[in-house]
Swiss-Prot record:
It comes from Oryza sativa subsp. japonica. Gene3D superfamilies: Aldolase class I, Quinolinate phosphoribosyl transferase, N-terminal domain. CDD domains: QPRTase. Signal peptide: none annotated. InterPro entries: Aldolase_TIM (IPR013785), NadC (IPR004393), NadC/ModD (IPR027277), Nicotinate_pribotase-like_C (IPR036068), Quinolinate_PRibosylTase_N_sf (IPR037128), Quinolinate_PRibosylTrfase_C (IPR002638), Quinolinate_PRibosylTrfase_N (IPR022412). This is Nicotinate-nucleotide pyrophosphorylase [carboxylating], chloroplastic. It is found in: Plastid, Chloroplast. Substrate binds at residues 162, 193-195, 217, 227, 260, 287, 319-321, 340-342. GO terms for cellular component: chloroplast; cytoplasm.
Length: 371
């Protein structure tokens, strides 16, 4: 390619670029001698990917969204940490040319998630950092397992550390609970809801996919979902469905349509409307048809009756009173999907740490007369 053409080539949108304001807040040290103890340890401690024994997995891509910018989310997370001065603790204690190696350690059992996002964050902070993973997103890790390492400028590793861990711990917590619920609910599929952390919608939903769940609607734009308030304002479930069909036909939109039902009578009314009209209805939500009992068990008889009434004509979704203890019994009713807001609104982060190699740090201290 001629030089002029190469210069005119647009930037790759998939390559993360460090925001100009952030660039001055991280360190980019000059190259170091290949004979240094750090380069030797790099060769010893970071095996080539071909020699790793991690379970191979096809990477799980984040959900698609027309306006959500994952790069901007990463930049925001870094900016709120860096402020207008950068990491003053690192600036005070660590020379800019010091290299270090840090290890990711699982502090408890669970499903790891956020590895792909961590790669993006490290690249955003310092493209020269070398990152190696011994596990993949979606793999099960045990307490004490070292599942990844990062090597390079010590300051920049520490700048990235908390942002990487905040995302990874949250995503791993979501993925761990999703995996447990998905396994218990089979053959029904587990869905999350829109009850996600503000600004982290795609990150939370990405973690659900990594954990083996499926995504409900991403936002208000990709599915028509008629809930109790819509039904109340529209004057009933039949009127609401009629208005939806008219709207989609007028706007020439082909979108999935879900309607929330709370009683068997509402299910019957909806089925009667669907039998008499050319409708866009695709899924019926069966809300709070799982009834808690005083002994800790649940009564799913109403849910079973609703599933039998629908008889496969539409997808079904159970919602309400869904927990890790109840999801198996709910899944046995024959519903297509089970949705749980708790997957993302009540997540317990998985404990993960990133530790700099102590022996390496002591060598740095001796070399800089700081030990």
């Amino acid at each position: 390619m001629p030089a002029a053409a190469a210069a005119a080539a647009p930037p790759n949108p998939n390559v993360l670029q460090l925001a100009p304001r952030l660039r001055g807040l991280v360190s980019f040290p000059s190259s170091y001698s290949s004979s240094s103890p750090f380069s030797n340890r790099l060769r010893l401690r970071l095996p080539r990917a071909a020699s790793m024994s991690a379970e191979a997995r096809v990477p799980v891509a984040p959900p698609a969204h027309p306006t959500y910018d994952l790069k901007a989310v990463i930049n925001l997370a870094l900016s709120e940490d860096a402020g207008d001065r950068g990491d003053v603790s690192c600036l005070a204690t660590i020379p800019s040319d010091v290299k270090a190696e840090a290890t990711f350690i699982a502090k408890e059992d669970g499903v790891v998630a956020g590895i792909s996002l961590a790669d993006m964050i490290f690249k955003q902070v310092d493209p020269s950092l070398k990152v190696e993973w011994f596990e993949s997103d979606g793999n099960y890790v045990h307490k004490g397992l070292q599942f990844g390492r990062v090597y390079g400028c010590a300051r920049n590793i520490i700048v990235a550390e908390r942002v990487v861990l905040n995302f990874m711990q949250r995503m791993s917590g979501i993925a761990t609970m999703t995996k447990a619920m998905a396994d218990a609910a089979h053959p029904a599929c587990i869905l999350e809801t829109r009850k996600t952390a503000p600004g982290l919608r795609l990150v939370d939903k990405w973690a659900v996919l990594i954990g083996g769940g499926k995504n409900h609607r991403i936002g208000l734009f990709d599915m028509v979902m008629i809930k109790d308030n819509h039904i109340s304002v529209a004057g009933g479930i039949t009127n609401a469905m009629k208005f939806v069909d008219r709207f989609l036909a007028k706007e020439k939109l082909a979108l999935p349509v879900e309607v929330e039902t709370r009683t068997l009578q509402e299910v019957k009314d909806l089925l009667e409307y669907a039998a008499e009209n050319n409708t866009s209805l695709t899924r019926i939500m069966l809300d709070n048809m799982v009834v808690p009992l005083g002994n800790g068990d649940i009564d799913v008889s109403m849910l079973k009756d609703a599933v039998e009434l629908i008889n496969g004509r539409f997808e079904t979704e159970a919602s309400g009173n869904v927990t890790i203890d109840t999801v198996k019994k709910i899944g046995e009713t024959g519903v297509t999907y089970i949705s749980s807001g708790a997957l993302t609104h009540s997540v317990k982060a998985l404990d993960i740490s990133l530790k700099i190699d102590t022996e390496l740090a002591l060598q740095v201290g001796r070399r800089t007369n700081r030990a």
